């Protein structure tokens, strides 16, 4: 058995076509969705990610504003810029590219962003609302994963979802989103003994730890859905996920590739949140 590939690239293309229509309708109503992106320092990966986000914004008709700062910027100057953007009527979403330099507190930055412009879904108010099932901006990668699984026609209710990883950005929130869809959720992490004994119970396995090819076929229940969030660069320059794709696809029922899996959906959910923020702010 060879797993069916869940292509985030194809799924994202379909969703972005619909988002472009929504953005065009907002423009026709006098509202041009705007996303402000703040980039601190000269990390090549961060610059690459931001470039991809700006390109995606242009594709669907979202105006993007890029603000770059040197790595030595002091925290208060950065927070002052965010406060300025919070009240800028042309800006509907604010994204601060992470990670930030060590001398800047990420939580101070995240908490300074107005919750109604927090299109990354990281603000404690949005996280809290997500936890209790209220309407909120959902974090982009977990939301993208949920949409991928649903769009593939996979029933979630009653399934055992195992999450490998417990980060605030992916691991913790993705489990909550699947719990809301009536899955039974188990979290695993670096301190979990006998990881394979637990992952082999998973109907849906979500891996987000940043360790190349951590998960092999011995971790997989035959026919399981395997979602690989990891992006790792090998010594030969090639990208790979946290899952040994070639080996695992012979056991799994569905699997996401790296690249071309979760990544395109993460950016697509950012676009979705920005357009939704523009719609909500325009209605006020």
UniProtKB/Swiss-Prot annotation:
A molecular-function term among this protein's GO annotations: methenyltetrahydrofolate cyclohydrolase activity
Keyword Nuclease: no
Ligand binding (NADP(+)): 165-167, 190, 231
GO CC annotation, single: cytosol
Alphabetically ordered keywords of this record: Amino-acid biosynthesis, Histidine biosynthesis, Hydrolase, Methionine biosynthesis, Multifunctional enzyme, NADP, One-carbon metabolism, Oxidoreductase, Purine biosynthesis
Domain of life: Bacteria
Family listed: Belongs to the tetrahydrofolate dehydrogenase/cyclohydrolase family.
Subunit structure as annotated in this protein's UniProt entry: Homodimer.
Full protein name: Bifunctional protein FolD
